[in-house]
Design a protein with these regions (language model features):
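Donor nucleotide-activated moiety binding/catalytic core segment of transferases
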Residues: 37-43, 163-218, 222-224
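Catalytic donor nucleotide-activated moiety binding site of glycosyltransferases and closely related
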Residues: 12-16, 137-138, 142, 150-189
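Short loop/turn segments at strand-loop or loop-helix junctions that form parts
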Residues: 6, 74-78, 131-143, 173-176, ...
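Short, well-ordered secondary-structure micro-motifs within conserved domains or adaptor modules
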Residues: 37-66, 70-74, 196-203
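A basic- and aromatic-enriched beta-loop-alpha substructure that forms the phosphate/nucleotide-
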Residues: 57-110, 204-205, 212
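Hydrophobic beta-strand scaffold residues
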Residues: 34, 70-72, 78, 170, ...
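Leloir-type glycosyltransferase catalytic cores
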Residues: 83-131, 227-279
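N-terminal pre-catalytic "stem/leader" segment of glycosyltransferase-like enzymes
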Residues: 1-49, 54, 142-143, 272-279
Length: 279
């Protein structure tokens, strides 16, 4: 297991929203000073980074981007949250999803797959190339508002482009309520049940889940699976099938980019981010 110096001093920082339970875990691990709103950031030095949670905090993110303040963005983890209660949360330095691949050890990944009951399905099975339909996963309101897109326009344009370049049927999967997306309603079940050939999405975590399950993906906006996804929908019949060794190294990196609340509360998450320059 990667050794982390738990006694190293964490520099001063800020955290928005003392009422948020996940932010509270990060605050406990970093001893961050709470502020109640992004509007209060102007009262603090730009040298102080700030922890922010969820795309609903887009004004805080935009404020940091405009002023050059570092921020730690916290949201749903990429993998392993198939159960009712989310276990893993991504923490991204100066971004919404991780984009700078890092070659890291495989220890966290092995812990996920070998030691966590019910996560054995995460092992990359190799590419599945004999599927039928295209699964189109639509964006929810939050990313649409954050990136300034019109959901229906994106959907119409995407469907039209796909239909120009393939005769495969298109199945649309809307995000819906969380309880509808876990257990039997998980995307993994649908990939199998509908024998999906490829997944198309805006920047949903569905791309990450599909790639790890051996189904290629196409994306429109930055996400952690970028390096393994095709962006050009005119190539819908010829998806990107990266080497297995690269997919596995990517999975090791994904495991280093998400954390439990306990890892946040002990400062382990922060120290891993800084040690491996994860962003």
């Amino acid at each position: 297991m990667t050794q982390i110096n738990s006694s190293s001093v964490i520099p001063p920082q800020l955290a928005i929203d003392p009422d948020d339970g996940i932010i509270k875990a990060w605050q406990e691990g970093t001893d961050a000073k709470y502020v109640t709103s992004y509007k209060e950031l102007k009262n603090h030095s730009l040298d102080l980074p700030v922890a922010i949670r969820s795309m609903a905090s887009r004004k805080a993110v935009r404020e940091c981007e405009a002023t050059g303040r570092d921020f730690y963005y916290i949201d749903t983890g990429y993998i392993g949250n198939r159960q009712k209660r989310k276990i893993y949360h991504r923490v991204v330095k100066n971004g919404m999803q991780h984009s700078n691949f890092a070659d890291v050890p495989d220890d966290r990944w092995r812990t996920y797959v070998e030691s966590t009951p019910g996560l054995q399905y995460l092992t990359f099975p190799g590419w599945k190339k004999d599927g039928g339909p295209i699964l189109l996963v639509t964006p929810s309101d939050k990313p649409c508002k954050f990136y300034g897109i019109n959901r229906q326009e994106w959907l119409d344009t995407t469907i039209a482009t796909i239909k120009k370049h393939t005769r495969r049927p298109i199945i649309i999967r809307d995000k819906g309520l969380r309880r509808e997306r876990i257990g039997n309603g998980s995307i993994y079940n649908q990939l199998d049940d509908d024998n999906i050939f490829a997944v198309v999405t805006y920047n949903s975590i569905a791309a990450t889940e599909a790639i790890g399950y051996g189904v290629p993906a196409f994306v429109s906006a930055p996400n952690i699976a970028d390096m393994l996804c095709e962006k050009d929908l005119t190539k819908i019949e010829t998806p990107l099938y990266s080497d297995t060794s690269l997919v596995e190294k990517w999975q090791h990196w994904v495991a280093y980019c998400q954390y439990t609340t306990n890892e946040m509360a002990t400062g382990t998450a922060y120290r891993l981010i800084e040690k491996y320059n994860l962003s």
